[in-house]
């Protein structure tokens, strides 16, 4: 099924704009204060909404890569270079590691990948050949599948796939579409995992990666996003248990795969931490309804998009063919 912009997503545009316009999250890039350029993310949202308006809400066959829709995909304010950067023990692509000092706002709950889960990151992991991508696409079924750092395979041909090449692009899609209520997954964070420098833990992963996951999770919490990230440490089954334990104990929610099935879970929910699958996976339950008998309402944030009211007579009320709602008018 292609990515579809529904009434519920449109209703979230104003909320997303408020979150993006709020005080910027305090970040550290290579040890120096910086901030995210949220204008880039709002521009991306506007571009995606405009494309959806031309196709009745469906983004089937539409290229929504940030590199295609935006002139500049850099979302970090660029600090001045220092000679000390060359000797830094941390190097994440071109931007360096960043940190988010604690939560900037209260988390909200989501219904994906499990009921009542807090906004942020859920790590999907497993040993080599454990079926992580199978679990992601057949059991969790995300609305948007970000493909990053993986070799070409059948999943790249899915209508939900968005192909990116940088950390900035990954954050633009996760925050931009995640803040609108889409279930977003990243397959995978291999470029982050393999390019970090520093001492490795017993599981073979650079220790700073665990804090990086927490930082990214706190960043997504600021914008009400629930994102599943595939972690592929390329270790055997014995070591993956250690890695899972480290992630579960000190960073983010986690799902462990084995032989194409979910073997263990730990979700951070509004009822506390839930271990070992007591909270079932909830694929598609957070998917906004396309047949609500409501009209599209005009948005306050015209800088992102404005939606003309929908005439009741143009709504496919029975929605028997599962087609997107018709009659929507988007304008920028």
UniProtKB/Swiss-Prot annotation:
SS bonds (residue pairs): none
UniProt keyword Transcription present: yes
GO molecular function: ATP binding; ribonucleoside triphosphate phosphatase activity
UniProt GO BP: viral genome packaging
Residue sites binding ATP per the record: 126-133
Assembly mode: Homohexamer. Part of the packaging complex composed of RDRP, P4 and P7.
Protein's name in the database: Packaging enzyme P4
Naturally occurring in which organism (per UniProt): Pseudomonas phage phi6
Gene designation per UniProt: P4
């Amino acid at each position: 099924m292609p990515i579809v912009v529904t009434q519920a997503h449109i209703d979230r545009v104003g909320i997303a704009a408020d979150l993006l316009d709020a005080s910027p999250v305090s970040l550290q890039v290579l040890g120096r204060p910086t901030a995210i350029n949220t204008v880039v993310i709002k521009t991306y949202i506007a571009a995606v909404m405009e494309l959806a308006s031309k196709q009745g809400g469906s983004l089937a066959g539409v290229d929504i890569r940030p590199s295609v829709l935006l002139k500049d995909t850099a979302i970090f304010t660029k600090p001045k270079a220092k000679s000390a950067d060359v000797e830094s023990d941390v190097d994440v692509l071109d931007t360096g590691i960043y940190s988010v000092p604690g939560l900037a706002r209260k988390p909200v709950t989501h219904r994906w990948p499990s009921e009542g889960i807090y906004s942020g990151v859920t790590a999907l992991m497993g040993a080599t050949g454990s079926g992580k991508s199978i679990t992601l696409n057949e059991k969790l079924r995300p609305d948007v599948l970000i493909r990053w750092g993986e070799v070409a395979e059948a999943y790249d041909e899915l209508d939900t796939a968005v192909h990116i090449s940088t950390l900035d692009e990954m954050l633009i899609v996760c925050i931009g579409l995640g803040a609108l209520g889409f279930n977003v997954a990243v397959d995978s964070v291999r470029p982050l995992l393999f390019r970090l420098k520093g001492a490795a833990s017993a599981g073979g992963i650079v220790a700073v990666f665990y804090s990086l996951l927490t930082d990214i999770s706190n960043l997504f919490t600021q914008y009400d996003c629930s994102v599943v990230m595939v972690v592929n440490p390329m270790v055997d089954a014995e070591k993956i248990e250690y890695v899972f334990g480290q992630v579960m104990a000190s960073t983010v929610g986690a799902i462990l795969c084995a032989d194409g099935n979910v073997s263990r879970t730990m979700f951070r929910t509004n009822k506390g931490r839930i271990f070992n699958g007591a909270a079932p996976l909830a694929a598609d339950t957070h998917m906004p309804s396309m047949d609500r008998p409501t009209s599209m309402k005009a948005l306050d944030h015209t800088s992102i998009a404005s939606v003309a009211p929908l005439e009741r007579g143009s709504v496919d009320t029975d929605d028997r063919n599962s087609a997107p709602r018709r009659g929507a008018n988007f304008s920028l």
